[in-house]
Amino acid sequence: MFSLQDICRKYLFQLPDSFDEYTLQVLGLYWEKHGSLQRIRKDAVFVQRNLIISINEALRIAASEGNGRVVKLLLSWEGNFHYVIIGALEGDHYDLIHKYGSQIEDYHMILSSIHNANTFEKCHELSNCDMWCLIQNAIKYNMLPILQKHRNILTHEGENQELFEMACEEQKYDIVLWIGQTLMLNEPEFIFDIAFERIDFSLLTMGYSLLFNNKMSSIDIHDEEDLISLLTEHLEKAATKGCFFFMLETLKHGGNVNMAVLSKAVEYNHRKILDYFIRQKCLSRKDIEKLLLVAISNSASKKTLNLLLSYLNHSVKNIIGKIVQSVLKNGDFTIIIFLKKKKINLVEPALIGFINYYYSYCFLEQFIHEFDIRPEKMIKMAARKGKLNMIIEFLNEKYVHKDDLGAIFKFLKNLVCTMKHKKGKETLIVLIHKIYQVIQLETKEKFKLLRFYVMHDATIQFISMYKDCFNLAGFKPFLLECLDIAIKKNYPDMIRNIETLLKCE
């Protein structure tokens, strides 16, 4: 059962002005050497009616003074047990640690709240861990004095490297600098890896400070070729990440913003870097053309393409073939759209290329839709290249029902009649004959198709169809008519085959 004093202490948020020191002491609301103590918020106390501090800070101070009564009061006000341990360690009051230590699951959890190196180390001792654990936690919570105190045990390069990497990853700059300047390391250049990975400018500048103070034994700063190679590699990484200020910092020490570096800026659409260095280096037209081709190959953004085209005054006549090849290679035709707006039309060569590379119908549909290309044109191009499967795929998408075969049949015959390209005609006629074999034609329509084959010198299809028609009424006179057409067109093979058929009649 709670006493009246306990209830008052826990829930009385505002003390009456009439309470004197004796009354406060009786209520347990008097803190020796400090004065009256009252709770004013869930997480704060009012000391001597003129000082507001957090409950946990008050708890730390009370524990450091060994004031168990005030500690108990503050804990009832929802204070954190961690601050009892911290304060007790500061004042060496191990009786409080013994009393409240059972409330602590893991003393490592307290370390983040400690700001004094001596207290930090004493708290870590309570966890009964080894020295390596202490050093790692000292890095984690930025306790450089602990590393300095135990400098004599940090002699193993491999372990020091592990600590250095941890400090870099945790971004504990004072510790990074101290380890880099003081301890022997296997790979001090690791600092640069983290600097670029985290885009951490402070680590980059520290890295260069260590490098040029001869703290990186693996890199000879007096070997100009090696140094330029390292710095240029850094410039390439910075361009990849879009870290413009990293590049400026690196250039203070050397390096070369070459085409490989600028190509990374293009690939990742870092226009600020591109714009700055194209102007600064006064790049030749040839180099800018190369960058444009890199942009096309990597599907760069419209803004990146536009920037590079603007430096070329949208004139690309020297690299038209290469542009088309780059577009065909990666399938991104954004540049074709841009150039068309500038009256540079690469639509047809690109379409021919896409057909040659046998891009999917879905892709080609996007392309012909974007540039408002008639399907007939695409089919004729595919026919010229002998891409029969592509034409079939296209027609299957356009005419989805089996009933549409008749429409396809007429459509293809009309295309053949408007084509001059011999191979293209042959490709379409092969498809027409395939369709003929699965549809039913009236006698009149069969004769029309035979005449069509003769008109276009489709000897193989004519002979194949002859077998289906030789018993039809009026076929022999029709053959004579076909012979006249073949003679007028001067188709020797067709003439010879028709004459042979007439002899057999």
From Swiss-Prot:
Q: Which Pfam families match?
A: DUF249
Q: What induces it?
A: Expressed in the early phase of the viral replicative cycle.
Database matches in InterPro entries: MGF_505
Tree of life domain: Viruses
Do the record's keywords include DNA repair? no
Q: Does the keyword Ligase apply?
A: no
Keywords attached to this entry: Early protein
What's this protein's function? Plays a role in virus cell tropism, and may be required for efficient virus replication in macrophages.
**Family (UniProt):** Belongs to the asfivirus MGF 505 family.
Its recorded name reads Protein MGF 505-4R
